[in-house]
Design a protein with these regions (language model features):
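Short Lys/Arg-enriched alpha/beta "domain-start" segment
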Residues: 326-342
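Sequence-structural signature of the catalytic-core scaffold of metal-dependent phosphohydrolases
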Residues: 1-91, 99-322
Length: 342
């Protein structure tokens, strides 16, 4: 039977019963308390949306994108492969952000050495109840189509992280729906972030973009592509991303709070970093971090700045596109209480 989720960006989104088991699991429900845009809500007050809605939205878009590309392209799959590939993509999309730390990318400065949020995602997919639910979905495909159509946590992670051998593998085609200049992750977050930030910069014609997707055959293997009639909407999509980075993601006040947040985390986290154990890691979400920030307001300036929304004055700001050799795409200095920081 399945279920439906009413999404503010895409309308009703359908999920199967087994997919709903993943959504209702504790690791996935944690994403309700992980903001998509970190401290951005202190600048654009509507930006309270979370990784939960984004993950479901990406699953919805990757389904539509795959259907459209295959329908428009000249590369065909068997019915069994078509169903298998689509289910693989839906699971990759649904689980791709499970490893995000509280306040998303703003936390990455305090990850254990050598680890990224993708590493925690892989641990969660393989080592928690998520693995059990994925294997249950795989079992239905084995029963219906045979053992070559099994779906495992390892396969989900390998496709998403590009570890499968063979550059011309059909799995490379699948990966491009989630990691390319035309991926469904970007398609969703641009629209979702624009909506909740109350800006228009990230808007583009999603229907035209999806309907323009096709398959290009290169050396006998499928590649995700845009049809000749979709050139303009693809340009619109690229520009939408550019303007969102300039106007929202690199907003100087938002970047200030990212810096404060990184400093605060080093104070409130045990040993100044998130735990490596996946179960301990999953105990951390935005709510717990906010509680810890409030508990340290009186003994840490960075914590106080976030909780009380104290913003330093901007002393100088570089151009958006720095010359070669600059450390980051956006530099600015902060001035407060006669102290100058760079």
């Amino acid at each position: 039977m399945g279920d439906k989720y009413r999404d503010p960006v895409h309308g009703f989104i359908e999920v199967t019963d087994l997919e709903n088991e993943i959504i209702n699991s504790a690791p996935f429900q944690r994403l309700r308390n992980v903001k998509q845009l970190a401290m951005t809500y202190l600048v654009f007050h509507g930006a309270e949306h979370t990784r939960f809605g984004h993950s479901i939205g990406v699953m919805h878009l990757v389904t539509r994108a795959f259907d459209s590309a295959v329908s428009n392209g000249s590369y065909s799959f068997s019915d069994e492969k078509y169903a298998w590939y689509k289910q693989l993509l839906r699971l990759i999309a649904l689980t791709h952000d499970l490893g995000h730390a509280p306040f998303s990318h703003a936390s990455e400065a305090v990850f254990p050495d050598g680890l990224e949020h993708e590493d925690f995602t892989e641990k969660i997919v393989k080592e928690t109840i998520i693995a059990t639910h994925i294997k249950a979905i795989g079992a239905t495909f084995v029963e219906k189509y045979g053992p070559e159509y099994d779906i495992t946590p390892e396969l989900i992670c390998d496709i998403y992280r590009g570890r499968l051998p063979g550059e011309n593998s059909e799995f490379t085609f699948l990966k491009s729906f989630m990691d390319s200049e035309l991926d469904c992750d970007k398609m969703d977050y641009l629209l979702r972030d624009s909506l909740f930030c109350g800006v228009k910069y990230g808007n583009y014609d999603i229907e035209r973009l999806l309907s323009s997707l096709t398959i290009y055959i290169q050396d006998g293997c499928p590649r995700l592509a845009i049809g000749s009639g979709g050139t303009q909407v693809f340009e619109e999509f690229v520009l939408a991303r550019y303007f969102m980075f300039v106007q929202v993601y690199f907003h100087r006040t938002r970047r200030f709070f990212d810096i404060m947040f990184s400093q605060a985390l080093k104070c409130i986290l045990p040993d100044g970093t998130y735990p490596q154990d996946v179960n301990d890691y999953l105990m951390w979400d935005d709510c717990r971090v906010i509680q810890e920030l409030k508990a340290h307001v009186d003994d840490n300036d960075a914590c106080a700045n976030i909780v009380k929304r104290v913003v330093y004055s901007c002393a100088n700001e570089s151009v958006t596109h720095p010359k070669s050799g600059d450390r980051s795409p956006h530099h600015f200095g902060l001035c407060s209480h006669h102290n100058f920081e760079r």
